[in-house]
UniProtKB/Swiss-Prot annotation:
Identification of the protein by name: UDP-N-acetylglucosamine--N-acetylmuramyl-(pentapeptide) pyrophosphoryl-undecaprenol N-acetylglucosamine transferase
Membrane topology: Peripheral membrane protein
InterPro entries in alphabetical order: GlcNAc_MurG, Glyco_trans_28_C, GlycoTrans_28_N
Gene of this entry: murG
Broad class of the protein's primary localization: membrane
Binding site for UDP-N-acetyl-alpha-D-glucosamine: 11-13, 122, 165, 189, 291
UniProt cross-references to PANTHER family, sorted A to Z: GLYCOSYLTRANSFERASE (PTHR21015:SF22), UDP-N-ACETYLGLUCOSAMINE--N-ACETYLMURAMYL-(PENTAPEPTIDE) PYROPHOSPHORYL-UNDECAPRENOL N-ACETYLGLUCOSAMINE TRANSFERASE 1 (PTHR21015)
Pfam families attached to this UniProt entry: Glyco_tran_28_C, Glyco_transf_28
Chain's role: Cell wall formation. Catalyzes the transfer of a GlcNAc subunit on undecaprenyl-pyrophosphoryl-MurNAc-pentapeptide (lipid intermediate I) to form undecaprenyl-pyrophosphoryl-MurNAc-(pentapeptide)GlcNAc (lipid intermediate II).
Family stated for the protein in its record: Belongs to the glycosyltransferase 28 family. MurG subfamily.
Amino acid sequence: MKTIFLVGGGTGGHLFPAIALGEELQERGYNVYLITDTRCEKYLLNSNYSFKIHIMNMVSISNTGIKKLYAYIRILAACITGFKLVYSNSPGLIVTFGGYTIAPIIINGILFKIPFILHEQNSVLGLANRLFLRYAKAITVTFANTLNLNNRYKHKVIVTGTPVRKALRFTPKRNFNSKNFQLLVIGGSQGTEIFSTLVPNAIKLLVNCDHDFKITIVHQAVAKDINYVKAMYTELNIEHEVSDFFYNIADKYKNSHLAICRAGASTISEIISLCQPAILVPYPISAQNHQLFNAKAIADNKAGWCIEQSTITPHILFEKIFTLMQSPTLLASTELKLREMKINAENLLANAVEKFIVT
């Protein structure tokens, strides 16, 4: 069976959908080769994926001075590595998921006349995808109304959604009437610094108001903030678990009644797959503000709540959490709306991939 390259790097948002597609394609009998970079290496720790994985040493070109020169040298080296990978494996197709790691592989794919398709997770077409779209066989998208997509390429669009990893493809049975209320705080694969102060201060207000709930917090924090966040929850006598990354994130979703999170495409796909009611706080300086569009797509479907970072305060967050804690019917109806938004993105994307494989 032919080899398929899956390429994505930089953040978990680019890596995890590639892994999800890899799992589906491997079940269909294809040889999968996952290519990412050193920034994503930590997300592969403790994993047991059976497909091949290559980790490239990429450096951001946003550096200045001697670091910028070093970055260009690394890019040249990555192009040489990409040449060797494509030449030695002769993939039947390349599928990319974003991040500048895709460039050396796509360039060599074009050189060797290997077809490739792009996947856009967000509601706004990213820079790398805009750059290579003219050469792509197709672009698979999460949102039918993806912005920044030139009309001349609309014929290449296939709506598939964003695939999620096998471990996250289930719908938990949550009891929203329970007085044991678990709150999940996630800031994407890299954590979110603002949540380190915003959420504990909102919980402080919650602890001091009159209610009969037992609150548990599971909080993914920026590594440098972990001790501070733990100390805050300990002072409030709140049961908590704080880490910079949860390898068993499926269990955290399964046991949580409400999430507070960013609105990156991977997170959005996960909360839809797991029907997780969530308060979305879009990252305000995401590329082309795509997280705001992602969050509004959820909120407009009454499948979650969007509060922009420029307006959110501990008191506003406290009021929203407190209202939802006391509204099990609203949480249940939100879960139902998310269930209605679920699609089998892994299957749809794998079907699209099979149309373009060179045998």
